[in-house]
Regions:
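Small-molecule kinase domains that catalyze NTP-dependent phosphoryl transfer to phosphate-bearing small molecules
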Residues: 61, 83, 112-145
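Glycine-rich phosphate-binding P-loop
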Residues: 1
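Short, basic, glycine/proline-bearing loop/turn elements
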Residues: 46-50, 100, 114-119
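Conserved beta-strand scaffold positions in the cores of enzyme catalytic domains, especially
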Residues: 4-6, 93-95, 141-143
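ATP-dependent NMP and nucleoside kinases share a basic, alpha-helical "lid"
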Residues: 61-110
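Conserved nucleotide-sensing/catalytic segment adjacent to the nucleotide-binding pocket
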Residues: 5-8, 14-67, 73
């Protein structure tokens, strides 16, 4: 076990008030990158504990404070963690890929059949457009298939 903290990009889900057509047309625009830039990025190199607020998707409101000890490894996980607006804040970039069938099976199990269609028609195409627009695969130090 490495220890350390995990910061989930899903905690920076874009709130409804910011979901404009213009924003959704930007590659990587469906993550609240402004909040990640102010609540996380400046704190990572400090070595001091900090916290950020988690967006609660089930209630569409800001949720609880998430403490980050920041005294060792900090893992930032999620599709949009490599957004170019964040700069070069990572020591290593690891891209984890998955085949379509396994991805669908996992989404179906986690979110149900009804929500699967949302992922297939909206969220996955947005992620794919972001990966392509910003060459996420090419910039990864490691790719795990």
């Amino acid at each position: 076990e490495l220890g350390g903290d995990v910061i989930h990009m899903d905690d920076f889900f874009l709130p409804p008030a910011l979901r404009t057509q213009q924003r959704r047309s930007e590659p990587g625009g469906n993550v609240h990158y402004e909040r990640f830039l102010t609540e996380v990025i400046p704190n990572l190199s400090s070595g001091r504990p900090f916290s950020y607020r988690r967006f609660d998707c089930s209630r569409m409101i800001m949720g609880e404070e998430i403490p980050v000890k920041n005294n060792g490894y900090v893992f930032v996980e999620g599709a949009y963690s490599c957004h170019p607006l964040f700069g070069d804040y990572m020591d290593r970039r690891v891209f984890l890929d998955i085949d379509g069938k396994t991805q669908e099976d996992r989404i179906r199990k986690r979110n149900g059949e009804d929500r699967l269609q949302d992922f297939l028609q909206l969220w996955i195409p947005l992620e794919e457009a972001y990966f392509q627009a910003f060459s996420v695969w090419e910039k990864a130090d490691y790719i795990i298939l």
